[in-house]
Amino acid sequence: MGSSSLSEDYRQCLERELRRGRAGVCGDPSLRAVLWQILVEDFDLHGALQDDALALLTDGLWGRADLAPALRGLARAFELLELAAVHLYLLPWRKEFTTIKTFSGGYVHVLKGVLSDDLLLKSFQKMGYVRRDSHRLMVTALPPACQLVQVALGCFALRLECEILGEVLAQLGTSVLPAEELLQARRASGDVASCVAWLQQRLAQDEEPPPLPPRGSPAAYRAPLDLYRDLQEDEGSEDASLYGEPSPGPDSPPAELAYRPPLWEQSAKLWGTGGRAWEPPAEELPQASSPPYGALEEGLEPEPSAFSFLSLRRELSRPGDLATPESSAAASPRRIRAEGVPASAYRSVSEPPGYQAHSCLSPGALPTLCCDTCRQLHAAHCAALPACRPGHSLRVLLGDAQRRLWLQRAQMDTLLYNSPGARP
């Protein structure tokens, strides 16, 4: 299979995932298996993909005493580069993706931590970025779509190469060896076993190889990487960013509908930041466990627990997300009543009905899109969507867990609005 055939398969994978509401790096298991096997047998495929594999791997591993964690860091950097190229290909109209801040958390911690500035700039130049000043890279002219697919595929291949090298180290029994010997053995071998045998013979000439460092617990799941948020905004958090704002979803035009953290990392504020949102004591909030890093497939999302108002508040909301009233006067009737405000104080306020399920949703069906302007939940192929897309605020609901929670919220809003005393 040539590089052009791989590029076409990779492109189809990205567009298939976009139709499912996900705009991210490739996770197709069959394409992954095919590319893995080709790379194992032929390291020179990297040359056909023009991904600068040897230069990037040498730069990222040079001088590292323990190669295993260095390879994991490189894989995460290549994933972030792949994501940047995928964003430009799938969502070229999103202006957020045309500017990368070199002082952002993703750039400083994930990219610059493992790769040199010159190689990073070269990688971004392939995507059409040029250095605007000492703090920003900007796209002045978007490259052809086929070039962006080729760059993203190259980064995907580099991620797999890091995993292949990690498998070699695991079978070798040590990850403490010179990087140049590992890369030399990898280029000279046609499979993992022969690469391991070559290294074993080489290490036996020197001394007994040191033992493999103890494996730690599986890395905690980290939010899908993006490149757009300032360093001061995400410093100390696991969510790395390269752009000015959190990454938006594929069908959400304005910047305020940017990508949101996973459900288990979201804030516990159902009614937004306007007014004094009630916060339960810390001990009342159960700590949700995180799935292993890399569990990006929809099927691996944690099943939501039994529905409750507390879980809905915790899972669904975060600052600026719910497009709810901005002032305390427009807060939830239940919350105002809980704070001791007389019912007459809010009955005089014309309160919106909250979110509602559009008529396109059949009973039991989960929504795919949420319009924050119409405050309605829609199916993916709703006939009313063309009227919303030009100027309304659309967000994509990713995964069954989030879709189910939004549907439950709409049902709750409807109940609150229709309940006695909810309206004047």
UniProtKB/Swiss-Prot annotation:
| Positions of post-translational Phosphoserine modification | 327
Q: For the region Disordered, what residue ranges are annotated?
A: 233-258, 273-300
Q: Does the keyword Phosphoprotein apply?
A: yes
Q: Which UniProt keywords apply?
A: Phosphoprotein
Q: Which GO terms describe its cellular component?
A: cytoplasm
InterPro entries membership: SPATA2_PUB-like (IPR048839)
One of the Pfam families matching this protein, by short name? SPATA2_PUB-like
Question: Does the entry feature the keyword Transmembrane, yes or no?
Answer: no
**Gene3D superfamilies reported for this sequence:** 1.20.58.2190
Which family does the entry's similarity section mention? Belongs to the SPATA2 family.
Record PANTHER family: SPERMATOGENESIS-ASSOCIATED PROTEIN 2-LIKE PROTEIN, SPERMATOGENESIS-ASSOCIATED PROTEIN 2/TAMOZHENNIC
Q: What is this protein called?
A: Spermatogenesis-associated protein 2-like protein
Organism from which the protein derives = Homo sapiens (Human)
